[in-house]
């Protein structure tokens, strides 16, 4: 049975990278343009998205621009410009004058997952090595990954400050350049004004999105959030409509990023908290569990120190109940649909077909028009079954159908979206797939599924539970005789999918690769037996894992190492670790594995130079002396550090960094009472 409530979902899945040009931007060969600029010793200027007001747009955004707007490259704005660096993995982006909080909330969610971010933002780009003023980004665009090439000229005011997206690190520019690339894809900066978080999340990932109306949310919302935060998801949310800042600190009609969740214990009862961030980088919630709330005194000293950061950075905690009260939509995006099904041990497959509604031929409108034109809509046959049981099985199959309409103009906001939906019929008899079903079929048969209402959205989708068999899908526009193109996709465990009367023939479903699926299933089963694990059980769990990038030199986690790891992550001083705490740990372990593997030369150890490089790679700056001391403390007699010791060091440094940042008032020092100091020094 699916964990997720039957709310309207939006589904996406990305095929392999493509070099196709999109309607919004021309085919530009990044490598050829870069080579030409380097050969000629010049900086790239993108004539298809010039540094002029035409790229800003022609609407209300022009009225917000500062006087004497200029376009400058990052090396003109800072003496040491950086494209990206790992230390900035904390939320550092701030919204500019464009009303694109929906885009920035999605971007902040993307920034929390460096492996996903690196697909959209190639992180090896810089302002030094092979710099020619040209940058490239990738977006999932209506079924394909497309590259978007831009120059690095950015709009600034007279003081040289960025007027659109900026970073709290003044020399960091990946966010501003990504916004420019997305504006180019959309038509202009003006075309980024207003939108849905789900739209940007999908364009960044090609992943699976589900939108939950919080007013209708079921009682298992916390379970959904736990599973979502563990499964490499991107999560955004939106407040109720309006345009003002409320007395409680929330902004009406605004998008936020959900950056974390935490179950804490207050006076022997649990409290469920969610952590959110305002894309403005300021203006925070003022209620219970806000930065100045007295509720924090109910926690253990260690838990308070590691969770509470008194800083007007736009990030704050609030209870799950307050979240449901003050927010209207929760948007969860994952790379594969496996998150939404409990059909264990089976891979997902998908099929994607493109089609079009043509005036006076295939644009038949909704079913109420069935007497005249409904039957003229495109018709698709779908056969589904459970692969492990064959086609004679009667057990239901999880199926997801997604209908996505393509833009009707190169500028995102120039032509509004049409109201779209789809109908699903059960086919009880064999049908010749070369002949369109006649009007009589639709007069005699009632749809198994139909739209509650037609939505003017980029995509409409539905999760279905179908008996094995053959079905008919009819995508349509609310009104007949409107021209548009669409993408129709189906996700299931096994299916065949094709268009009636099409020359393209039968399309068999393709497997979706999810390398984490088996691992996730293993963890879930382990914690079903042991809801809270101690150091011995943690040791058992970690030593059962295969560390793929470490090759034949698989690490061994000693009991002492696991006791040290547990002490670092045990915020409520219970001596055990919950599945939520383990999931946080596992994310950090996977990142540490990548960093270690990159610097290791096949010996299974890091020397001083490699350790220094690994720490820099992770965004941690240690002096030479401290780095040497870390080798003495965590390395062996030969001053070499193995993987397990490296993990312990990384976790400890992250822990100490969080303590300092949460407690410091001036960025230079902190104040701790003696009990707090003893707790942090001895049990961490």
Curated annotation (Swiss-Prot):
Keyword hit for Protease: yes
Residues in EF-hand domain copies: 557-592, 586-621, 651-684
Active site per the UniProt annotation: 101, 254, 278
Stretches for region Linker: 504-517
GO molecular function: calcium ion binding; calcium-dependent cysteine-type endopeptidase activity
GO cellular component terms attached to this protein's record: cytoplasm
Biological process (GO), any one: proteolysis
UniProt: Ca(2+) binding residues: 570, 572, 574, 576, 581
Main function: Calcium-regulated non-lysosomal thiol-protease.
Protein name stated in the entry: Calpain-14
């Amino acid at each position: 049975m699916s964990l997720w409530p039957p709310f309207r979902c939006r589904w996406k899945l990305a095929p392999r990278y493509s070099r196709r040009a999109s309607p919004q931007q021309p085919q530009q060969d990044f490598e050829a343009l870069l080579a030409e600029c380097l050969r000629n010793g010049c900086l790239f200027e993108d004539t298809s998205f010039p540094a002029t007001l035409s790229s800003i747009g022609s609407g209300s955004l022009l009225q917000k621009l500062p006087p004497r707007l200029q376009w400058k490259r990052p090396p003109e704005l800072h003496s040491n410009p950086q494209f990206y660096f790992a230390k900035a993995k904390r939320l550092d982006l701030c919204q500019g004058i464009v009303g694109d909080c929906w885009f920035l909330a999605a971007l902040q969610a993307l920034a929390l997952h460096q492996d996903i971010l690196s697909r959209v933002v190639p992180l090896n780009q810089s302002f030094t090595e092979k710099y020619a003023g040209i940058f490239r980004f990738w977006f999932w665009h209506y079924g394909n990954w497309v590259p978007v090439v831009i120059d690095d000229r950015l709009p600034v005011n007279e003081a040289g400050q960025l007027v659109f997206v900026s970073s709290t690190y003044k020399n960091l520019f990946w966010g501003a350049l990504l916004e420019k690339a997305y504006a180019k894809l959309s038509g202009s900066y003006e075309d980024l004004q207003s939108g849905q978080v789900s739209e940007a999340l999908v364009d960044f990932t090609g992943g699976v999105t589900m939108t939950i109306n919080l007013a209708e949310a079921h009682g298992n919302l916390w379970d959904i959030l736990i599973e979502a935060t563990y499964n490499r998801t991107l999560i955004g949310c939106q407040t109720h409509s309006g345009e003002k800042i409320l007395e409680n600190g929330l902004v009406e009609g605004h998008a936020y990023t959900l950056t974390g969740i935490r179950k804490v214990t207050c006076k022997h009862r649990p409290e469920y908290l969610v952590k959110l961030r305002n894309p403005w980088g300021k203006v925070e919630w003022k209620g219970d569990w806000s930065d100045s709330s007295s509720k924090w005194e109910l926690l253990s000293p260690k838990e308070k120190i590691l969770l509470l950061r008194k800083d007007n950075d736009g990030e704050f905690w609030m209870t799950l109940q307050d979240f449901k009260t003050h927010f209207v939509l929760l948007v969860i995006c994952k790379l594969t649909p496996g998150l939404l099904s409990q059909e264990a041990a089976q891979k997902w497959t998908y099929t994607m077909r493109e089609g079009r509604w043509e005036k006076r031929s295939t644009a038949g409108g909704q079913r109420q028009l069935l007497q005249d034109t409904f039957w003229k809509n495109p018709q698709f046959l779908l056969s589904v079954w459970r692969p492990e049981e064959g086609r004679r099985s009667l057990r239901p199959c999880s199926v997801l159908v997604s209908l996505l309409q393509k833009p009707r103009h190169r500028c995102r906001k120039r032509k509004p979206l049409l109201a779209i939906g789809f109908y699903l019929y059960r086919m009880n008899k064999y049908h010749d797939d070369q002949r369109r079903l006649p009007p009589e079929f639709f007069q005699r048969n009632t749809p198994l599924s139909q739209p509650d209402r037609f939505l003017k959205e980029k995509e409409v989708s539905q999760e279905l539970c179908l008996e094995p068999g053959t079905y008919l899908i009819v995508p349509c526009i609310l009104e007949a005789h409107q021209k548009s193109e669409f993408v129709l996709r189906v996700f299931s465990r096994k299916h065949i999918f094709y268009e009636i009367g099409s020359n393209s023939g039968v399309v068999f479903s393709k497997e979706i690769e999810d390398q984490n699926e088996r691992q996730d299933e293993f963890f879930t089963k382990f914690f079903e037996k042991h809801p809270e694990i101690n150091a011995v059980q943690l040791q058992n769990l970690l030593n059962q894992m295969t560390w793929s990038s470490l090759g034949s030199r698989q690490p061994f986690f000693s009991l002492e190492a696991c006791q040290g790891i547990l002490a670092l992550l045990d915020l409520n001083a219970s001596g055990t670790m919950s599945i939520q705490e383990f999931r946080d740990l596992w994310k950090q372990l996977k990142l540490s594995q990548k960093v270690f593997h990159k610097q290791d030369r096949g010996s299974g150890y890091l020397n001083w130079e490699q350790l220094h490089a690994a720490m820099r790679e992770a965004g941690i700056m240690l002096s030479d002396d401290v780095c040497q001391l870390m080798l003495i403390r965590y390395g062996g007699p030969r001053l070499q550090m193995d993987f397990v010791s490296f993990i312990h060091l990384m976790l400890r440094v992250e822990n100490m960094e969080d303590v300092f940042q949460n407690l410091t008032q001036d960025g230079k020092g902190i104040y701790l009472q003696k009990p707090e100091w003893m707790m942090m020094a001895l049990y961490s």
